[in-house]
C-alpha cells in the first residue's frame, strides 16, 4: 500500500505520515528532507539555492547519508529547500529516488508537496492537509521553541507565506491537491484527531465490510 500525503509547510503532514506508517507497518519518507538536504548542501558550498546549476548538481550527487545532517531542520535549510524545489532539474533528479522508495516492500507513506500529483499519482490513497498560514505559523513557532530555538511569530509567518507562494506558483509540480485526494482542514483539529480521521478513511477504503464482521 502506498499512502501519499501533501500540503503546505507546517500543515501536519509529517506527524500524520509518521503515525500512519507506524500504525500500518509501512516505510516512511519525509520527502521534504530530500529538498532540505539539497538546499543545505548548496548553502554549505556558499552558493545561491535559486541557482539552477548549483542546485541541480547538488541534487544529482545526493546520498542517503545527506539525509542524516544535523542542520536539516533549521529554518535556513527549510527556506533553501523551497527555492531549490522550484528548479525543474532538481525535481527531476530526485523523482526516481522517491519512486523507488515508494515501490519497495511492504509499502510506504510519503509526505511532501507533489506526492499525489507527480511522485505517486497511482498511490492507493491520497490526503491533502489544509491549514491557514496563521495557524501553521503558530505551530512552527512552538515546534522551534520546543527544540530550544528562537522563533519570532511575524518572521515565521512571513516566511511561510513566501514559501506558499513559491510552492504553489512554480511551473514544475506546483503545490495543489490531487483530484482524488481526501482534503482535511486541520485548523481546528489536533494531530490525534487528524490521525483518527485518516485511519478511518483508509480502513473504509480497503476494508468496507470490516465493521460488519464480514
Predicted stretch roles:
Residues 8:
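P-loop (Walker A) phosphate-binding loop of NTP-binding proteins
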